[in-house]
Amino acid sequence: MKRTYQPSRVKRNRKFGFRARMKTKGGRLILARRRAKGRMKLTVSDEKKKY
């Protein structure tokens, strides 16, 4: 049986990246909450790895 997690950096960034979060009102609220909490990394795109 195939495992459910098949990592892809492109898909991950498209779904959970900074620009994806900025697109929707809800995503911007997530960023605001994470900023208020003082998170070092706001989104997965902040992990800054090469492709």
Swiss-Prot record:
Pfam families: Ribosomal_L34
Statement: the UniProt record of this protein carries the keyword Mitochondrion: no
Keyword Ribosomal protein: yes
InterPro entries: Ribosomal_bL34, Ribosomal_bL34_CS
Gene Ontology CC terms: ribonucleoprotein complex; ribosome
Superkingdom to which the source organism belongs: Bacteria
Keywords per UniProt: Ribonucleoprotein, Ribosomal protein
Disulfide bonding pattern of the chain: none
Any GO MF annotation of the entry: structural constituent of ribosome
Any one of the GO BP annotations: translation
Recorded family membership: Belongs to the bacterial ribosomal protein bL34 family.
Name of the protein: Large ribosomal subunit protein bL34
Species for this entry: Borrelia garinii subsp. bavariensis (strain ATCC BAA-2496 / DSM 23469 / PBi)
